[in-house]
Structures are given as structure tokens and as C-alpha cells.
Amino acid sequence: MEITNAEFVISNTDVKKCPAGTFPEYAFIGRSNVGKSSLINMLTGRKGLAMTSATPGKTMLINHFLINNSWYLVDLPGYGYARRGQKGQEQIRTIIEDYILEREQMTNLFVLIDSRLEPQKIDLEFMEWLGENGIPFAIIFTKADKLKGGRLKINISAYLRELRKQWEELPPYFITSSEERLGRTEVLNYIESINKELNSK
């Protein structure tokens, strides 16, 4: 898939105010500071499309970007940023859950995982919750360029082992690096394949 057009449409905290229409939506979510904004900018080829920050927890809104005038890329708030405080975390959780459970246009959720880390309980519990609610999702391992030698393979294998404890069939997964544009083609082709399937119905 070639992205010829990517434009910001709207930010909000209320799923009912998300764009009308039937365009499929591909949402991106992950723990704070997982590299979500950098990944979105890399995928779209637009350096400043999503705001990047070294400070975790900056994305507090549901952000819609219209891609090729045919589908939406949705940037969801990051989860698990403790310094927001309990009230702030609850507000973010409500925004995330409302979008994921109520937004009919959401076609696939991409869960971003920092490939530098061992399996994190918060990520595994979030994916288990997705499974319990029948939410279609794929995993994107980020920051692959930060690991040397066989560490990347070891970390991903550890995650897959943990997932197999919960899942009979593993969700699709992709390995990416925003710095090296690794995985861009694979993720976009995956989105394109789903769009083609939807259009054939």
C-alpha cells in the first residue's frame, strides 16, 4: 500500500463524537512511551503527523487521521502511566474502553509492545481483556533497532510463550523500527489486505 494522503481530522475524549461514516478504522494503542507517535509518523511517511514526546502519557485523546480518503488511522491514549494519578488513569481507561467496545467502525486494533522489555503484566492482561471481549487485534513490536545480537529474538519468543498460555492461536505480529522504517511494508500490506476483504463483501 502506498499512502498518498494523510490528514488530521479530529481529537476528542468522547467516542460519540468520532467521525461519522463507514470507513474502517485501525487503532493503535500501547503503554506510555512505547513509540506510538513515531510509528504512526513512520507508517504514514509524515514526520509531524502525530505528536512525539519524550514525556510518557502525552496522548490523552482519541486522534483520527484520514488515510488515502478511504480509512482512518486512530491514535489512542497510552495506558499504564502511573504519574497521571488514579483519577487520571481511570479517565483514560474509560476513553479507551468506550472506543474499543463501542466503536463499530474499528476494524483492527494494533497493540504496541516495546521489544526491549521482558513480557509486561499490563500488556498481557490488556490482550487477555481484548480476547475476552472478542476484539480483533495484532501486535506490533517497536524499537527493534535498539537491541543487539539475538536479544530481539529472545524477547519476542518470551512474549509468544506467555501468549500461548492464554491463546490457542496467536494473533498476527509485526517487528518494527521507526528509525529504520522496518516493518512498514508488512503493517501497511496487512491493513490493505483487510480493506480488500471488506470491499469484496
Curated annotation (Swiss-Prot):
Binding of GTP, residues: 30-37, 57-61, 75-78, 142-145, 175-178
GO molecular function, one term: metal ion binding
Residues binding Mg(2+): 37, 59
Boundaries of every EngB-type G domain copy: 22-197
Gene Ontology biological-process entries: division septum assembly
Keywords associated with the record: Cell cycle, Cell division, GTP-binding, Magnesium, Metal-binding, Nucleotide-binding, Septation
Gene3D superfamilies in the record: P-loop containing nucleotide triphosphate hydrolases
Entry similarity comment: Belongs to the TRAFAC class TrmE-Era-EngA-EngB-Septin-like GTPase superfamily. EngB GTPase family.
Function: Necessary for normal cell division and for the maintenance of normal septation.
Name of this protein: Probable GTP-binding protein EngB
Organism: Bacteroides fragilis (strain YCH46)
